[in-house]
Curated annotation (Swiss-Prot):
Ranges of Basic and acidic residues composition bias in the record: 372-382
One Pfam family named in its UniProt record: Ank
Native species: Homo sapiens (Human)
Species classification: Eukaryota, Metazoa, Chordata, Craniata, Vertebrata
ANK repeat copies, ranges: 32-65, 66-95, 99-128, 132-161, 165-194, 198-227
Protein name: Ankyrin repeat domain-containing protein 20B
Length: 823
């Protein structure tokens, strides 16, 4: 694909055909194509780049899969620190990537001026070209960065560098309609004589791309207005063919200024001498010759500029002399257009014009007169037919391509004619004649201006006549049977020599007509052959263009089909993934509801345990009171210590229960917050289809964490169930102790009744001792239960921490995903 090319339509800049070369960032970066040092260069992490170079010094000029170095990527991203680090490490500054672009070209392309300045200071070559033939200056022209262009030129950039289309930066700025860059390059003395492959000058390109501002700038630089391209067309012809009236007026005004300057150089004496001499020569001719001369002069003036001469030779082409202005009067009646004409192009134009006027005049009389004139012309000019055929054909093609500017050509013709006559005939006339003929010259100039305007209209009429001439080709085919019949008649006339004189005259007339018709048929056949060849060439060109267009259309259709298939596949895949995510979300919501219900059950169980503990404490306090009344001081102290420990244990259990309830409320709040975040993430998942894979990984991680949390929760439930069983056992033992206490109270009553029985008292004391031991055992069991409660608390704390860590990990994953997308 070409970088620079002219648009297919008039006035269209080259930007439409450039595509991705000048739009967006310089590179399409994919993470899979990069190494560590390249990733660090893209991010602008100079420290990481330095670490990579410290590990492996060979990574300094390492290339990725697209043949890009770290310097290319840093220049494209505009990371000045990385560029300075790599340049100071003496990397290859002029290394090229896959498109043969240097880091300097890439920096200018991405408009990273700081990076470009660093590279230029360290000796980067600004004249290297990429695969499209463009230098860094071409890219600076496209981006219209005068500061970058100035720095490139100050460091030795070639201002006349050519791309593949032979466009200099000035021509490329004109094609892209960059008026500021055109002014800048002209100030830097860019050449206005540069041409492209079709030999089109800067002015022609400015006209072709409809840039009147650039045209005015170039005209101020005194650019060559008469320069021609390969087809012989100048800037004014471009303006006429594209109907650009404003630009045409600008060029005409500039030409008139040039002509005025040339006229001012010629003296007034020379002008008067020329006018007098011209008038005397006209008066000296006979009347019939005078008429023919006026026709010839009117015909010669406009044909002079119909084909402007290329390059610096346009001044010679403007020196047109009147057909009979310098020749003697005797040569005029023959109306040979070759007399007095120096330029071969002008000679052909005059000859063509005279032949056309003769044909136009001969078309008026009757058919018999036409036959006579054809007969005379065939007798006089048969040897000249073969020579004039090729010139007439080329002249017809040239006249169909170009329309002359009659006003400027007439003025230039008059001026050159006056110069020639003024030099050959210096002041040889008296003063009276000068005054008389000055008036005549003014009248003649006015008449010539009107004639020039009429000639422009006549040229159009001539083109219409040529269309009629091409129609005569069909008539030529129709004349072939008549020619054959005439030949048969001539043969019969030859075979019958004994006929009378009238038949002999008829045969002579038929022979003459036959010769004339043969000559006309030969001319028409040659014209038909040329037309056929031209048509065949055009058809071949059109067929090639059609094949190319068909191939491009087929390739585009295939590409579009592939894109559609890829889009449908990706859409179907994304829909499946979204459906899977929805199912997972519903499943997670159900699991969360189950967890809520289980938490509510746990809270109810904890409340029931608290009520049971309160009842047990009350019963235990009653038993202690009874024991206080029974026991002595020593026994009372033991009972007090036991009650204190039990009360402290119970208070601890209450505190733990309250703490657990608070934790459950906090977990509910966190769960609700997580639920809201989950909803937000679900909404963001719909918007961000590209992050679905990473979200799936996160969801899988969360599922694993939830499963682990479920297992932890089930373990906690089992432990709670064990603790409840143990509490039930404790309650049963307390009831048993209460019963034993009641039995002991009864025995004490009996003892009080029976004070004499000391053995019973000792047994009771033993019973109290055993009950004290049992109380110690119960205290140990209660301590174990407290330890288990502490362990449960620790497991709950770990559960909450793991939840928090899971949320943090999800946030970190999202942060890394967003950072990757930004990169």
């Amino acid at each position: 694909m070409k970088l620079f090319g002219f648009g297919s339509r008039r006035g269209q800049t080259a930007e439409g055909s450039i595509d991705h070369v000048y739009t967006g960032s310089g590179y399409r970066i994919r993470d899979s194509e990069l190494q560590k040092i390249h990733r660090a260069a893209v991010k602008g992490d100079a420290a990481e780049v330095e670490r990579c170079l410290a590990r492996r010094s060979g990574d300094l000029d390492a290339r990725d899969k697209q043949h890009r170095t770290a310097l290319h990527l840093a220049c494209a991203s505009g990371h000045v620190q990385v560029v300075t680090l790599l340049v100071n490490r003496k990397c290859q500054i002029d290394i090229c990537d896959k498109e043969n672009r240097t880091p300097l070209i890439q920096a200018v392309h991405c408009q990273e001026e700081a990076c470009a300045v660093i590279l230029l200071k360290h000796g980067a070559n600004p004249n290297l070209k990429d695969i499209y033939g463009n230098t860094a200056l071409h890219y600076a022209v496209y981006s219209e960065s005068t500061s970058l262009a100035e720095k490139l030129l100050s460091h030795g950039a070639h201002i006349e560098a050519l791309d593949k289309d032979s466009n200099t930066p000035l021509l490329f700025a004109i094609i892209c309609k960059k008026e500021k860059m055109v002014e800048f390059l002209l100030k830097k003395k860019a050449s206005t004589h540069a041409v492209d492959r079709l030999r089109r000058s800067a002015l022609m390109l400015a006209v072709y791309y409809d840039s009147p501002g650039i045209v005015s700038i170039l005209l101020k630089q005194n650019i060559d207005v008469f320069a021609q391209d390969m087809c012989g067309r100048d800037a004014e012809d471009y303006a006429i063919s594209h109907h650009l009236t404003k630009i045409q007026q600008q060029i005409l005004e500039h030409k008139q200024k040039i002509l005025k300057k040339e006229k001012s150089d010629v003296g007034s004496s020379d002008e008067s001498a020329v006018s007098i001499f011209h008038e005397l020569r006209v008066d000296s001719l006979p009347a019939s010759d005078d008429k023919d001369l006026s026709v010839a002069t009117k015909q010669c003036v406009p044909e002079k500029v119909s084909e402007p001469l290329p390059g610096p030779s346009h001044e010679k082409g403007n020196r047109i002399v009147n057909g009979q202005g310098e020749g003697p009067p005797a040569k005029h009646p023959s109306l040979k257009p070759t007399t007095g004409v120096e330029d071969p192009a002008v000679k052909g134009a005059v000859q063509r014009k005279n032949v056309q006027t003769l044909r136009a005049e001969q078309a008026l009389p009757v058919a018999s007169e036409e036959e006579q004139e054809r007969h005379e012309r065939s007798e006089k000019k048969q040897p000249q037919v073969k020579k004039g055929n090729n010139t007439n054909k080329s002249e017809k093609i040239q006249l169909s391509e170009n329309i002359c500017d009659s006003t400027s050509s007439a003025a230039a013709g008059r001026l050159t004619q006056q110069r020639k006559i003024g030099k050959t005939y210096p002041q040889q006339f008296p003063k009276k004649l000068k005054e008389e003929h000055d008036k005549c010259t003014l009248k003649q100039e006015n008449e010539e201006k009107t004639n020039v305007n009429m000639l422009y209209k006549k040229n159009r009429e001539e083109l219409e006549r040529k269309e009629k001439q091409y129609k005569k080709e069909v008539e030529a085919k129709q004349l072939e049977p008549t020619v054959q019949s005439l030949e048969m008649k001539s043969k019969t006339a030859r075979n019958t020599p004994n006929r009378d004189f009238h038949n002999h005259e008829e045969t002579k007339g038929l022979m003459d007509e036959n010769c004339i018709l043969k000559a006309d048929i030969a001319i028409l056949r040659q014209e038909i052959c040329t037309m056929k060849n031209d048509n065949l060439e055009k058809e071949n060109k059109y067929l090639k263009d059609i094949k190319i267009v068909k191939e491009t259309n087929a390739a585009l259709e295939k590409y579009i089909k592939l894109n559609e298939e890829m889009i449908t596949e990706t859409a179907f895949r994304y829909q499946q993934e979204l459906n899977d995510l929805k199912a997972e979300n519903t499943r997670l919501n159900a699991e969360l509801l189950k967890e809520k219900e289980s938490k509510k059950r746990l809270e109810a169980d904890i409340e029931s345990y608290q009520s049971r503990l309160a009842a047990a404490i009350g019963k235990h306090s009653e038993s202690v009171k009874t024991e206080r009344n029974v026991k002595l001081a020593l026994e009372r102290t033991q009972d007090v210590s036991v009650q204190v420990e039990m009360s402290s244990a119970i208070s601890k259990v209450k505190d733990e229960n309250e703490f657990l309830t608070e934790q459950l409320s906090e977990t509910q709040i966190k769960f609700n917050a997580l639920k809201d975040k989950f909803r937000k993430t679900r909404d963001s998942l719909r918007k961000k289809s590209l992050a679905l894979e990473t979200v799936q990984n996160d969801l899988r991680k969360t599922q694993q964490q939830t499963q682990e949390m479920k297992e932890m929760y089930q373990n906690a439930e089992a432990k709670v169930n064990n603790s409840t069983g143990k509490w039930n056992c404790v309650e049963e033992r307390i009831c048993h102790l209460q019963r034993e206490n009641a039995w002991l109270v009864q025995q004490l009553d009996d003892v009080h009744q029976k004070e004499d029985h000391k053995e019973i008292v000792t047994n009771i004391q033993r019973g109290f001792i055993e009950s004290g031991k049992k109380d110690l055992v119960l205290e140990e069991k209660s301590k174990k239960l407290m330890n288990e409660c502490d362990h449960l608390k620790e497991s709950l704390f770990q559960y909450e921490r793991e939840k928090a860590e899971g949320v943090v990990s999800i946030k970190e994953d999202k942060y890394f995903q967003t950072s990757r997308k930004k990169i």
